[in-house]
Amino acid sequence: MGVIELHGLRKEYRRIRGGRTVAVDGLDLEVPDGGVFGFLGPNGAGKTTTIRCVLGLVRPNEGSLRLLGADVSSGLAGVIGKVGSIVEQPALFPRFTGRRNLQILGRIHRVGRSTIDGVLERVQLSERADDAVRTYSLGMKQRLGIAAALLKDPSVLILDEPANGLDPAGIVEVRELIRSLGAEGRTVFVSSHILSEVQQTADQVAIIARGRLVKAGPVHDVLSAGRARGLIVKVADVPAAVRLLADAQIPTVVSGDALSVDLPPDQAERVTRVLAAGDVYLSELRPDEVDLETVFLELTKDEGLGP
């Protein structure tokens, strides 16, 4: 049984000029307990709408939802205390200090000073806790939002596009925080359209497009669904290797200190034979890495959902 379970989830919206838009289209999804789960797709894929349905912010037209084993189709009263979330941007008071922001929320959740100090330390904001939030970087504001979501010590943390709009330093800060939260045994559900970032963070992923599930599973398995783009070859004598491969009519491009060979991985032995015949020996031979962005484009194209 998953921590989050969706079966046949569908959400439609009425258009102003008539007709209906389908935001989520019969989505089936199961999120396992513990670790970081990446919920991926382009802008407009239905990620935020799905999260809003899970959190009870909007009601789906069809389908069932279970959160922490409880049916939440009609409300989250039984589990809301175990779930923390940020949907889009965290709601903060910019003129107040970071600590004051958490104290206001702490009254709602009935938590004391020690809890507030603990979450500030957890997100590495203790040294800036008494500065006004308006002086924070975007990454710091996002970390403060995550601190607010941690006040209830939730077992499930749902973050909608937490790296959106951040500079590289802020992205790294949030990435490391998400990783560490997942390592603590929490389930961290992260939606994003930045596929390369989630690849560095998530244990499992689901890819959606146009409100429909395209692929789900452990990151390694999803990456395996992509088609390798070729081979990476490293040798001591690059010019000699280029000549030998060209003579064998094997397309090759020099990329730094490596060669990018346009052959599928199952023809790696052919490359080895050609180079060895010319007394050029390999220091490295491996498939060209397939990333989540490549897999996403391939899978959505196969499903007729791509551009």
What residue ranges belong to the model's regions?
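Short glycine-rich hinge loops at helix-strand junctions in the catalytic core
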Residues: 124, 249, 279
